[in-house]
Amino acid sequence: MGTRLFFYVALCLLWAGHRDAGITQSPRYKITETGRQVTLMCHQTWSHSYMFWYRQDLGHGLRLIYYSAAADITDKGEVPDGYVVSRSKTENFPLTLESATRSQTSVYFCASSE
């Protein structure tokens, strides 16, 4: 029996100016075995240029994994190792854990901004 990891994926809503950016993250919760590939989806309802993936570990603040300034433009954050992102459309910014490890057990947040 493989070691199981818990990935807590939270819904994060950020406000930009006087309007809110609707963010949908899925799945909301994810349990997987070590070594498996996991993709967390992030979809925004506004056409914001910037999108972000963060993780929050027990006893720590938010840490940036990756961000995107526009479709097809992504860059590494503070803790990018073991993750891959893509952004072919303005609305979507999936985060993939290439081979899930215990150290990636965390709460994950996606956000967007103008």
UniProtKB/Swiss-Prot annotation:
Gene source species: Homo sapiens
Keyword check for Cell membrane: yes
Key words, A-Z: Adaptive immunity, Cell membrane, Disulfide bond, Immunity, Immunoglobulin domain, Membrane, Receptor, Signal, T cell receptor
Residue ranges of domain Ig-like in the record: 22-114
InterPro entries per UniProt: Ig-like_dom, Ig-like_dom_sf, Ig-like_fold, Ig_V-set, TCR_beta_variable
Summary of the function given for this chain in its UniProt record: V region of the variable domain of T cell receptor (TR) beta chain that participates in the antigen recognition. Alpha-beta T cell receptors are antigen specific receptors which are essential to the immune response and are present on the cell surface of T lymphocytes. Recognize peptide-major histocompatibility (MH) (pMH) complexes that are displayed by antigen presenting cells (APC), a prerequisite for efficient T cell adaptive immunity against pathogens.
Subcellular location per the Swiss-Prot or TrEMBL entry: Cell membrane
PANTHER family assigned to the protein according to its UniProt record, in alphabetical order: T CELL RECEPTOR BETA VARIABLE 10-1-RELATED, T-CELL RECEPTOR BETA CHAIN
Secretion signal, residue range per the UniProt entry: 1-21
Any single biological process term in GO: cell surface receptor signaling pathway
Pfam families noted in UniProt: V-set (PF07686)
Protein's name according to its UniProt entry: T cell receptor beta variable 10-2
Quaternary structure, from the entry: Alpha-beta TR is a heterodimer composed of an alpha and beta chain; disulfide-linked. The alpha-beta TR is associated with the transmembrane signaling CD3 coreceptor proteins to form the TR-CD3 (TcR or TCR). The assembly of alpha-beta TR heterodimers with CD3 occurs in the endoplasmic reticulum where a single alpha-beta TR heterodimer associates with one CD3D-CD3E heterodimer, one CD3G-CD3E heterodimer and one CD247 homodimer forming a stable octameric structure. CD3D-CD3E and CD3G-CD3E heterodimers preferentially associate with TR alpha and TR beta chains, respectively.
GO cellular component: plasma membrane; T cell receptor complex
Disulfide bridges in this chain: C42-C110
